[in-house]
């Protein structure tokens, strides 16, 4: 009986040892000098790199002379592709996950892969580095003691209004992503629920040559970006 228990324990350990791992590798959000050294090494050692957009990531891969095969992993294939990647890790392969820019798993498809790895008892390891939301927060001049991250507001009108109504009572610093062509619309909506005098910092081109941070109140931000449209 003792032999059988030990034997089963050894087999279990062997199964655990044979599993691969998932590395969440942060990449630059604009400046290639911000690429984590550890991420470069792990991406080179991995069996495959799962990239949100292989066409975009190939520039990064080539710059750092990484020859690991890439596979696409994005919003429209995340469920099936996550299962396929989990199967590979269960067979002992190591996967490095990267996003278009910054830290994977934050408001991107990486969340689903992490979830499936956890369910399959596969080790998930973070390789820290740039993250646009945190970079914006720490240079904003707004309170960093308590904050919430909203990512992109919903595009569906009903869902968007529900979220905006929830934010109306939010007193913490809010981090919100927005595309340039929708900035004025979103700022106007926020002004209507938060008031004209709510402090704001609009951060653009973070870590790049033309990085800008516009610190003001919402009403002035709306007026300023409207004036740029009419130039």
Where are these regions (language model features)?
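Glycine-rich, flexible N-terminal cofactor/catalytic loop recognition
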Residues: 13-76
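Short glycine-rich anion-binding loops that position phosphate/pyrophosphate groups of nucleotides
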Residues: 29-32, 100-104, 180-182
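Short active-site oxyanion
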Residues: 43-49, 122-125, 173-174
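Glycine/small-residue-rich loop that forms an oxyanion/phosphate-binding "nest" at active or ligand-binding sites
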Residues: 85-124, 128-131
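Class I SAM-dependent methyltransferase SAM-binding "motif I" and its flanking Rossmann-like core
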Residues: 112-170
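Anionic-ligand binding region
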Residues: 160-164, 186-227
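Conserved small/polar residues in nucleotide/adenosyl-binding loops
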Residues: 229-231
